Amino acid sequence: MSRAVGIDLGTTNSVVAVLEGGEPVVIANAEGNRTTPSVVAFSKDGETLVGDVAKRQAVTNVDRTVASVKRHMGTDWTTEIDGKKYTPQEISARTLMKLKADAESYLGDTVTDAVITVPAYFNDAERQATKEAGEIAGMNVLRIVNEPTAAALAYGLEKGKEDELILVFDLGGGTFDVSLLEVGKDEDDFSTIQVRATAGDNRLGGDDWDQRIVDWLLEQVKSKTGADLSKDKIALQRLKEAAEQAKKELSSATSTTISLQYLSVTPEGPVHLDEKLSRAKFEDLTKDLLARTEKPFKDVISEAGINVSDIDHVVLVGGSTRMPAVVEKVTELAGKAPNKGVNPDEVVAIGAAIQAGVLKGDRKDVLLIDVTPLSLGIETKGGVMTKLIERNTAIPTKRSETFTTAEDNQPSVSIQVFQGEREFTRDNKNLGTFELTGIAPAPRGMPQIEVTFDIDANGIVHVSAKDKGTGKEQSMTITGGTSLSKEDIDRMVKDAEANADADKQRREAADRRNNAEQTAYSVEKLIKDDEGAIPEDVKSEVQADVDAVKAALEGDDDDAVKTAFEKLQSSQTKIGEALYAQSQAEGAAGAGAGAAGAEGAQAKEDDDIVDAEVVDDDNDGKK
């Protein structure tokens, strides 16, 4: 019987875990380690090296070794080795194949299914790429799960029965996420884990801390020897490895010595490095990186609508959270010390293994509810972003809304799908466009076009549009090439905050234009339909106001539209007054003709009158 595993596919290291007897177990690799470096190398004789062996030979095989490829997932990045171009999916697949083989060796069985984790702020392109990597590795990807959610799943199941809020602070090798989750258990020990809010930075991680040490060491070498090693690939690889080791040592020691003999050779002779780096200096070099963790933290608290004091537990995920400065920052932000009972390197894979067990039916005591990080919508008249699914909505989810045509006898509509937080589509990210054709000829406003957004449990978006009248339907799936980059997400959120007022004013102006156009259309139609019943002077006045609105709409002056629209709103009431007056006059004439007959019947009717009171009882449910 094939087995399902949970995999934490990390930037720096990866971990695989499996359920054994209903409990998660981390699987050690062939080298005996519980974490596997996410490093892939191609030897000159054609052998593919993965993990520890690839990392060990990196210095002597720099051009044929690839690390931290997770940062390129969902992009068009490639690396060429021996004339063959490799995509991030292909490189990641090599790491996944290694984890799969190690798991099969441990289990003595084949592994066909996997739950793979990704940063919570991964966009559609990055999620698709991760899923493709799993498929390239020969696995059926049961689910793409957010890393902080998996961590909370592993941690939260050990909690008591009361509902608790868990904040997961996930600083990995290349990405950063903060998520707030609500964990609860019922009397039958069934756990529900629901994500309340998530935020992050896909370009912030331990690699950036390492790079600061590398940059500092390059400066030290240049100032003392005059040698510029910034273009020396072998020297840079040695410095990177030394920097990573120094970072780890400074998590437990207040200082460390970095000593690299024969780092390079110049015309003046060999270049040696022997530098002492204190924790204080290291923290000073990286203080701006640490400061970047504050905003996502505060965004999550704000999005969830809670106070910091409401947080019950803080869980640290990712090896980079071992740095003392990070622990201090989290304690400062959360107002409480993080939990010490979680292994930050393994907790995500454990959660993924639990979710794999849930999906395979091996565990039935937990429900996981995740969210989508950005709002999704379509463009409507005036370039307005009409949101169908708001950010931080629980997934999987499906939302539908009915729209109509903007012109008479419109044969088709163009459905443009956007992602972002701004009021106008021009400020958001266009995910794709498709046409719904074959709409039956009809006056504008009559066709009913139902647009449906469907986000699956992997966070991947599907959109469809259906003409309710003809039954014609068209759909699309948002695929990797059209998804957002992290920079786009950050820009959208920042722009939305900075331009909220301007967006509101533009939205009001667009709505006013739409209302003015609709009113002018309706009033003009009313004049034509009841032409004989409307006095000529009223008809002329109102038609002039309709023409003024149409003229204003052709220009770009929103104030002119507002003025013309207000005048039309005022004058159109005269049509109603005229029609009502005519109706009353016709009624009065009819009443006069029947008055004589009414008098004869009055005496008899008076005898039948019951002296009673009509009571309108709001509490009476009878109609």
From Swiss-Prot:
GO terms for molecular function: ATP binding; ATP-dependent protein folding chaperone; unfolded protein binding. Coiled coil: none annotated. Disulfide bonds: none annotated. The modification Phosphothreonine is found at T175. Residues 605-623 have a biased composition (Acidic residues). InterPro entries: ATPase_NBD (IPR043129), Chaperone_DnaK (IPR012725), Heat_shock_70_CS (IPR018181), HSP70_C_sf (IPR029048), HSP70_peptide-bd_sf (IPR029047), Hsp_70_fam (IPR013126). It comes from the Bacteria. Residues 497-521, 585-623 are annotated as: Disordered. The keyword Nucleus does not apply. Belongs to the heat shock protein 70 family. PANTHER family: HEAT SHOCK PROTEIN 70KDA. The keyword DNA-binding does not apply. Keywords: ATP-binding, Chaperone, Nucleotide-binding, Phosphoprotein, Stress response. It comes from Kocuria rhizophila (strain ATCC 9341 / DSM 348 / NBRC 103217 / DC2201). This is Chaperone protein DnaK. Acts as a chaperone. The lineage of its organism: Bacteria, Bacillati, Actinomycetota, Actinomycetes, Micrococcales.
